[in-house]
From Swiss-Prot:
The gene is dapL. InterPro entries: Aminotransferase_I/II_large, DAP-NH2Trfase_DapL_Desulfo, DapL/ALD1, LL-DAP_aminotransferase, NHTrfase_class1_PyrdxlP-BS, PyrdxlP-dep_Trfase, PyrdxlP-dep_Trfase_major, PyrdxlP-dep_Trfase_small. It catalyses: (2S,6S)-2,6-diaminopimelate + 2-oxoglutarate = (S)-2,3,4,5-tetrahydrodipicolinate + L-glutamate + H2O + H(+). GO terms for molecular function: L,L-diaminopimelate aminotransferase activity; pyridoxal phosphate binding. Its EC number is 2.6.1.83. The lineage of its organism: Bacteria, Pseudomonadati, Thermodesulfobacteriota, Syntrophobacteria, Syntrophobacterales. Substrate binds at residues 15, 40, 104, 128, 178, 366. This is LL-diaminopimelate aminotransferase. It holds the Pfam family Aminotran_1_2. Its cofactor is pyridoxal 5'-phosphate.
Length: 388
């Protein structure tokens, strides 16, 4: 019997990062020394004290049973405490914190809780592909909000037509931003809250990169702004902050009613995060944060090497204050795919074409600071030898 994919799958382009992995594996199999700047997966190890807590927790048989659907109360209390210390935001751990199997899982399930077939979501572009795909899976439609250099890679809310705004059910935002590295300040979040109130729109803020910042910059939580908790929720992850991408642990916080809806979806789809991983997460959030400071130092060192090198060879990268991404315009005459293909074929460097994140990403590539500083230097040297 021939397998026929569901129509929704036929609408999907190849998943961007899966395609990058495929190309990398193909070149590696041919003996090419590949420098992978394509995927935002930290190369740094999870800190030792977090690993040690996982070991002891995993040896406790009580952690081997099904976890709570909404997360261990101890973990949610820890999240609330971290939000209070880091952002000054008060949260009720029992109703305003929901444990996730990584923030991607929560973001992917979120539209199922808030979007009906035919509803409209306001989705930034270029952006993490999950926002649009999850909306489509829920039967919704995306209205794309361009993120362009001239507006600081922030969506221009004033340009959204009134009839679109009235139809919109949810707005996705993400700051510090993937892929552009842009950041948002209080005035932008205030506009978002006012827009949400005027048009009765739910705000979904992906805040996975707030702890990956440089030079003393402290990114805001959306929930620091008055009224934010009335209109939206914020998604966070331990993946980037503590180098725990493979552990799959995150959380959503904010409006209790919205989180209850997401929790209802999750309880019918998954069985929660492994309790031993949640205990390790508590150690991460409550333990010495020196590991976060060290992570920031390492990425800043790599960032400086890459930015200086790109400028030296005639490119004009955006200089981020946060995230571990560099958003760099392509040389004149090159499309995003053309330039990323040149880097791959001629230099063995994997960089992500900006167009893969959405049409306004055309003319850019994204490079991730996820190799050590010597490999960053090597990547710059290989690029210097190219003709473009």
């Amino acid at each position: 019997m021939a397998f026929v994919k569901a129509e929704r799958l036929k609408l999907l382009p190849p998943y961007l990062f899966q395609e990058i992995d495929r190309l990398k594996a193909e070149l590696t199999a041919k003996g090419v020394d590949v420098i992978n700047l394509g995927v935002g997966d930290p190369d740094l190890p999870t800190p030792d004290h977090i690993i040690a807590r996982l070991k002891t927790a995993a040896e406790d048989p009580s952690t081997h049973q099904y976890p709570s659907y909404s997360g261990m109360n101890d973990f949610k209390v820890s999240v609330a405490g971290w939000y209070k210390r880091r952002f000054g935001v008060e949260l009720d751990p029992l109703s305003e914190v929901l444990t996730l199997i990584g923030s991607k899982e929560g973001l992917a399930h979120f539209p199922l809780a808030v979007i009906n077939p035919g509803d409209l979501a306001l989705v930034p572009t270029p952006a993490y592909p999950v926002y649009h795909v999850a909306t489509m899976f829920a039967g919704g439609e995306s209205y794309f909000m361009p993120l362009v250099r001239e507006n600081g890679f922030l969506p221009d809310l004033d340009s959204i037509p009134a009839d679109v705004a009235r139809r919109a059910k949810v707005m996705f935002i993400n700051y510090p931003n993937n892929p552009t590295g842009a950041t948002a300040e209080r005035d932008f979040f205030e506009k978002v809250i006012a827009f949400a109130r005027e048009y009765d729109v739910i705000v979904c803020h992906d805040a996975a990169y707030t702890e990956m910042a440089f030079g003393g910059y402290r990114p805001l939580s959306f929930l620091e702004l008055p009224g934010a908790g009335e209109v939206g929720v914020e998604f966070h992850s331990l993946s980037k902050t503590y180098n725990m991408t493979g552990w799959r642990l995150g959380f959503a916080v904010g409006n209790a009613d919205i989180l209850a809806g997401l929790g209802q979806v999750k309880s019918n789809i998954d069985s929660g995060a492994f309790n031993a991983v949640q205990w390790a997460g508590i150690t991460a959030l409550e333990g010495d944060q020196g590991c976060v400071v060290e992570m920031q130092r390492i990425y800043k060192e790599r960032l400086d090497i890459l930015i200086e090198g790109l400028k030296r060879i005639g490119l004009h990268p955006e200089v981020p204050r946060a995230t571990f991404y560099v958003w760099c315009p392509t040389p004149p005459g090159y499309s995003s795919k053309d330039f990323s293909s040149l880097l791959l074929r001629e230099a063995g460097i994997v960089a992500t074409p900006g167009s893969g994140f959405g049409a306004p990403g055309e003319g850019y590539i994204r490079m991730a600071l996820t190799v050590d500083k010597e490999r960053v230097r090597e990547a710059v040297e290989r690029m210097r030898k190219l003709s473009f």
